[in-house]
């Protein structure tokens, strides 16, 4: 029997890598997109003849019920969200509606249509925010420091609530920062790699950033989607931290990125206070011990490999290599 999977947020970074993985595993893949959305399909352009894209909206439960009834997926991966932390401060209500309540609408649609569907919720390290312990575990208390983090906490707890209340196979992956050449330009890692390529090619002469001392646990998105899939292949539903267990600063990212093209980052990077967050999170670093123990998962891509991959891809992009996103 061919398994069918529904991915919300399929046009995003994680959705595109997850779609590739599921296709390789022999799945039929259905991607949900919003009819009103202005999102680009470039991340899945190389897959579009192998997947079905259908209309649905996390703000509209009737559309979710109809979608589940029509396509009868065995697994649902909820990756759709208003996912940019900075935007969540200017659009807190929309962030709550999509990133928080949208999870409830999807879970309730599953409960009504087919409670045997296995559900994955994309939780986030931003839920920890003002951290209570280092490294962060599945049991670490949440103290979110942005409307995005607050909405993700709601989505996380409602997933657990539906698991316990209705016996749904519902899992949350608490993913720490994960990057790739497909990362949006609004995220600091891609902002850096893209600027490095532009500076190297003579198309820019400086890069303005916020807090260079901000530290994150950065991994490769292509590695992390494997953990999502593995969660739904287990005998019992559970929640897992997905991380590298290492922390690096924005400054380190700059050093490696500029170093890749033989430039001194300090000559080009300018600190601009407008890029500082209203409330900065503390030291986010996750322990992937449980995922390693129970899922037999661990990251394959090192931090320097990730940075170099992103710089190389942006150089290729700016030099007209349109196949860079399929990598």
Regions found by a protein language model. Give the residues of each.
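NAD(P)-dependent short-chain dehydrogenase/reductase
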Residues: 131-135, 145-147, 153, 157-233, ...
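C-terminal "lid/loop" region of Rossmann-like NAD(P)-dependent oxidoreductases
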Residues: 207, 211, 238-240, 248-255, ...
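Alpha-helical residues within the helix-turn-helix
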Residues: 293
